[in-house]
Amino acid sequence: MGMSLKGQLLTFFGIFITVGPISFLVLKNDLNNKKREYFKLYKQEQAKQLENAKSSKENK
């Protein structure tokens, strides 16, 4: 009829063990993409500040 408790536990942990690493990799990939985007924006901001500093020195 129904599954035994042992079968249910094995199914539960089987799903957990299978899906856990996949979701971890997806989250890790998403975090890496966000980090990459953040550093790209950070570098652009630094370049703007450097350019503004150079132009303000030239204007003096």
From Swiss-Prot:
Where does the chain cross the membrane? 7-27
Localization per Swiss-Prot or TrEMBL:
Membrane
Q: What is its main location?
A: membrane
Topology versus the membrane: Single-pass membrane protein
Task: Give the superkingdom in one word.
Answer: Eukaryota
State the UniProt keywords alphabetically.
Answer: Membrane, Transmembrane, Transmembrane helix
Tell me a GO cellular component. Answer: membrane
Entry protein name: Uncharacterized protein C21B10.15
Q: Which organism is it from?
A: Schizosaccharomyces pombe (strain 972 / ATCC 24843)
